[in-house]
């Protein structure tokens, strides 16, 4: 009976690292002209060991505008407790209510900077000086009281704004009165005050219609589209008396812009006479080609306009 076995010849045919034995070097020749080691070949005599430089603050130069100076008071390592203002008090809520948003913003960051300075000094006092005095912590607590009161006042204003906006959205008569009052004030400003007038218009369009200067932040709805038409109309009326072309555009449309495509052209134009005049030339071409936008297509059309505008600005 035959048995299946591995062939024994594979071991003999296996390839080793060297297919041929390496020849032995029988002739070892002695090297001639051997250079003896010298001092020049190992190191240079020009190197000298210098004494170590002791660490000192004189060797470190810090520019005066370095950001970390904000954690120091008058560039002092640490103020003495006698130098601290221990007689001051925290701001009261009635006092903060009389301040503007800019004042509250500045006061908040002033308090934040002072608390950072006090926190560093208190850390040095407790860890480096091994002192348990609470002078720095007491002043920091006063400042913290001012900061939470600032947040309280801002929260009051935010809730008041939200409630006023809800009430305003439900009262059509109140909206019309506000628009009429703003329109009168906006158009009565002198031509030398164009910059101030358009700053007013920017705040007005954001507060009433949610139209933001940042394109990506806008939500296109019916209120947005109606606001777009009103803002374009006010923009043209601002320059109506200064240019015949602008006046003709308004007269053709009964004194206001009703097409959202025309409104978008005026809205995206710069706030100056030349840019608005060029926008009116574009409106003439739209009217000649009868390229109007129906009311049913206004929302998707404006969304497409904004999407293309965002793509153009990001390129």
UniProtKB/Swiss-Prot annotation:
Can you tell me which family this protein belongs to?
Belongs to the universal ribosomal protein uL29 family.
Principal subcellular localization: mitochondrion
Q: How does it assemble?
A: Component of the mitochondrial large ribosomal subunit. Mature mitochondrial ribosomes consist of a small (37S) and a large (54S) subunit. The 37S subunit contains at least 33 different proteins and 1 molecule of RNA (15S). The 54S subunit contains at least 45 different proteins and 1 molecule of RNA (21S).
- One Gene Ontology molecular-function label: structural constituent of ribosome
- Please state where this protein is localized: Mitochondrion
Is the keyword Transmembrane helix assigned to this protein?
Answer: no
Keywords, alphabetical: Mitochondrion, Ribonucleoprotein, Ribosomal protein, Transit peptide
A GO CC term attached to the entry: mitochondrial large ribosomal subunit
Top-rank lineage group of the source organism: Eukaryota
Q: Which InterPro entries match?
A: MRP-L47_sf, Ribosomal_uL29_mit
One example of a Gene Ontology biological process annotation: mitochondrial translation
What lineage, starting at the top, does this entry show? Answer: Eukaryota, Fungi, Dikarya, Ascomycota, Saccharomycotina
Name the chain's protein. Answer: Large ribosomal subunit protein uL29m
């Amino acid at each position: 009976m035959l048995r299946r076995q591995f062939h024994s010849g594979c071991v003999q045919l296996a390839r080793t690292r060297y297919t041929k034995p390496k020849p032995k070097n029988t002739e070892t020749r002695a090297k001639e002209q051997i250079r003896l080691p010298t001092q020049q070949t190992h190191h240079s005599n020009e190197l000298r060991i210098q004494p170590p430089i002791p660490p000192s603050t004189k060797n470190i130069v810090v520019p005066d505008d370095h950001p970390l100076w904000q954690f120091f008071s008058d560039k002092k390592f640490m103020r003495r407790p006698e130098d601290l203002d221990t007689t001051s008090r925290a701001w009261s809520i009635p006092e903060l209510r009389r301040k503007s948003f800019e004042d509250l913003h500045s006061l908040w960051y002033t308090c934040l900077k002072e608390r950072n300075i006090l926190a560093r000094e208190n850390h040095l006092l407790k860890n480096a000086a091994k002192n348990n005095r609470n002078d720095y912590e007491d002043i920091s607590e006063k400042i913290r009281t001012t900061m939470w009161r600032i947040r309280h006042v801002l929260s009051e204003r935010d809730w008041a704004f939200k409630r006023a906006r809800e009430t305003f959205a439900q009262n059509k008569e109140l909206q019309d009165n506000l628009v009429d009052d703003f329109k009168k004030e906006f158009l009565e400003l002198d031509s030398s005050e164009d910059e101030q007038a358009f700053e007013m218009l920017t705040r007005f369009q954001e507060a009433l219609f949610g139209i933001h200067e940042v394109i990506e932040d806008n939500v296109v709805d019916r209120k947005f589209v109606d606001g777009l038409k009103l803002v374009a109309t006010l923009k043209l009326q601002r320059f109506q008396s200064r240019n015949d072309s602008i006046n003709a555009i308004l007269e053709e449309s009964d004194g206001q812009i009703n097409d959202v495509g025309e409104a978008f052209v005026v809205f995206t134009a710069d706030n100056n006479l030349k840019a608005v005049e060029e926008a009116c030339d574009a409106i003439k071409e739209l009217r000649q080609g009868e390229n109007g936008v129906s009311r049913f297509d206004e929302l998707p059309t404006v969304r497409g306009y904004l999407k293309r505008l965002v793509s153009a600005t990001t390129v």
